[in-house]
């Protein structure tokens, strides 16, 4: 169970970052990414997430809400089947598991690494870290793929599907061959209050700094 929770936390970072990577479908995928990173500063929405192993085994589906604000701030709040909160204030990433009474704290750079989060939080050229390409349309969505150039990124690829110029689905294949699908809804671009990204560990919980 603890391993599943840790994996879910890492995938939450992937999902928020991949969301921020999805631009309006216009020119090339690279041009769209560059434009989106330069112009979209934040958004809120809802998600449903499921993970399937290479053998077809499924983990319990998750659902909740998210928010992000460039650069470096995000909130991923799992509501079902169990509560979990992941918050970045731009410097540190806090993962809070209420039923474990534990908060894990990591530096943003350590938590993000070379994941798709670099698309959201990074300030450099995307082409330095990712190979971005267009994919054929499917399921009524337009798709692009981002593949990390770093072999130690922890995932092999992330695909982003768009509808009506908004991200609707993210499909990430991790280093173990697991596929995580995140369905996005109620997406509302716009500034998010700084208070959304503030987190103080509740009194009495264990705080583990990584």
Swiss-Prot record:
It comes from the Bacteria. CDD domains: LolA. Keywords: Chaperone, Periplasm, Protein transport, Signal, Transport. One of its GO terms (cellular component) is outer membrane-bounded periplasmic space. Residues 1-26 form the signal peptide. InterPro entries: LolA/LolB/LppX, OM_lipoprot_carrier_LolA-like, OM_lipoprot_carrier_LolA_Pbac. It is found in: Periplasm. Gene3D superfamilies: Lipoprotein localisation LolA/LolB/LppX. Pfam families: LolA. GO terms for biological process: lipoprotein localization to outer membrane; lipoprotein transport. Monomer. Participates in the translocation of lipoproteins from the inner membrane to the outer membrane. Only forms a complex with a lipoprotein if the residue after the N-terminal Cys is not an aspartate (The Asp acts as a targeting signal to indicate that the lipoprotein should stay in the inner membrane). Belongs to the LolA family. This is Outer-membrane lipoprotein carrier protein. It comes from Bordetella pertussis (strain Tohama I / ATCC BAA-589 / NCTC 13251).
């Amino acid at each position: 169970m603890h391993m599943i929770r840790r994996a879910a936390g890492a995938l939450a970072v992937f999902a928020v970052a991949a969301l921020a990577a999805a631009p309006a479908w216009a020119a090339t995928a690279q041009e769209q990414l560059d434009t989106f990173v330069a112009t979209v500063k934040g958004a809120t929405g809802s998600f449903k997430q499921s993970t399937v192993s290479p053998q077809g085994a499924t983990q319990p589906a998750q659902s909740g809400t998210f928010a992000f604000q460039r650069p470096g701030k995000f909130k991923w709040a799992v509501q079902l089947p169990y509560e979990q909160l992941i918050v970045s204030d731009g410097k540190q990433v806090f993962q809070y598991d209420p039923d474990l009474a534990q908060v894990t704290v990591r530096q943003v750079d350590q938590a993000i690494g070379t994941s798709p989060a670099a698309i959201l939080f990074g300030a450099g050229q995307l082409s330095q870290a990712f190979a971005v390409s267009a994919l054929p349309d499917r399921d009524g969505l337009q798709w692009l793929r981002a593949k990390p150039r770093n072999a130690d990124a922890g995932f092999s690829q992330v695909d982003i599907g768009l509808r009506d110029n908004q991200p609707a689905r993210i499909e990430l294949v991790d280093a173990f061959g697991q596929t995580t699908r995140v369905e996005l809804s109620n997406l509302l671009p716009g500034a998010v209050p700084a208070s959304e990204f503030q987190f103080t560990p509740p009194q009495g919980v264990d705080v583990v700094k990584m």
